[in-house]
């Protein structure tokens, strides 16, 4: 009988490390509207393979030159971009600081790249990618288009797609007064993601046993035409090789 490797981030998510990102912005257009706050929440894996929320990092961000800021958006998130006591830093500095932590976490978890976890993740990923392009950051540790969306997961698991409702449906706490802060929303998103993953733990373990019985599986080429850095998945679920997470080629989703 094939021995199945212990559950790690690398085996649980096929070599990718989920990192929760939430942004607060001056609108809905990632190309024209300001990025005002960004928070990252790192996850921890317990000895039994279940997930828990870990460290939170949050930065206030200075609007880029010429950035649009809609009054309606500022009313929702309660941010005064020009408040003299707001400890805001440049987009590039905020990204570099978070990315440094993400790269360290990727190496520690023996993963190949990070995948953004977000509630309506396309929104956060679009703003992240737009800020990366503006700041000309060369080493983005996040996959450019793959993500884990907790709006989708909440709908599947609990029948709720709104963050507050999905959080409450999952049996977690919600503080309306703290909502629309990047750090608070990212932490609730992390809790929701961990809860759903943990509830699907039995399904995941059954799938690992099923795949292990099939023998080694070849990984299909990525949409970019490049070979995936994991190349082949062993019967244990362990990637047979890994690559530098800062490499420019994106692995398949």
Model-derived features: positions:
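Conserved non-catalytic scaffold segment of RNase H-like nuclease domains
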Residues: 2-122
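Acidic active-site catalytic centers that drive phospho-/nucleotidyl reactions
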Residues: 22-24, 124, 149, 185
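Active-site-proximal helix-loop-helix substrate-binding element of RNase H-like nuclease domains
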Residues: 61-77, 81-84, 150-190
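Amphipathic alpha-helical interface surfaces
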Residues: 69, 94-98, 124-131, 146-149, ...
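Acidic, Mg2+-coordinating catalytic module of metal-dependent nucleases/exonucleases
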Residues: 115-122, 126-132, 161-220, 252
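Histidine/lysine/aspartate-rich catalytic loop segments that bind and position anionic ligands
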Residues: 132-137, 141-156
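Long, low-complexity, intrinsically disordered segments
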Residues: 223-253
């Amino acid at each position: 009988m094939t021995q199945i490797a212990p559950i790690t981030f690398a085996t649980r998510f096929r070599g990718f490390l989920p990192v929760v990102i939430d942004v607060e912005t001056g609108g809905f257009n990632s190309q024209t509207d300001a990025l005002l706050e960004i928070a990252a929440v790192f996850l921890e894996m317990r000895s039994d393979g279940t997930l828990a929320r870990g460290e939170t990092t949050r930065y206030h961000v200075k609007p880029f030159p010429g950035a649009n800021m809609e009054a309606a958006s500022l009313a929702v998130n309660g941010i005064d971009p020009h408040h003299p006591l707001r400890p805001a830093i440049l987009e590039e500095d905020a990204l570099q600081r978070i990315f440094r932590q993400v790269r360290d976490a990727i190496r520690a978890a023996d993963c190949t790249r990070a995948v953004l976890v977000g509630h309506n993740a396309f929104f956060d990923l679009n703003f992240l990618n737009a800020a990366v392009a503006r700041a000309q950051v060369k080493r983005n540790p996040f996959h450019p288009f793959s993500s884990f969306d907790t709006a989708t997961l909440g709908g599947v698991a609990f029948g709720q797609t709104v963050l507050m409702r999905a959080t409450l449906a999952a049996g977690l706490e919600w503080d309306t007064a703290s909502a629309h802060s990047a750090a608070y929303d990212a932490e609730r998103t992390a809790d929701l993601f961990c809860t759903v993953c943990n509830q699907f733990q039995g399904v995941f373990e059954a799938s690992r046993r099923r795949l292990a019985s099939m023998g080694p599986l070849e990984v299909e080429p990525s949409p970019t035409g490049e070979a995936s850095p994991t190349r082949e998945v062993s019967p244990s679920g362990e990637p047979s090789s890994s690559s530098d997470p800062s490499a420019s080629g994106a692995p398949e989703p």
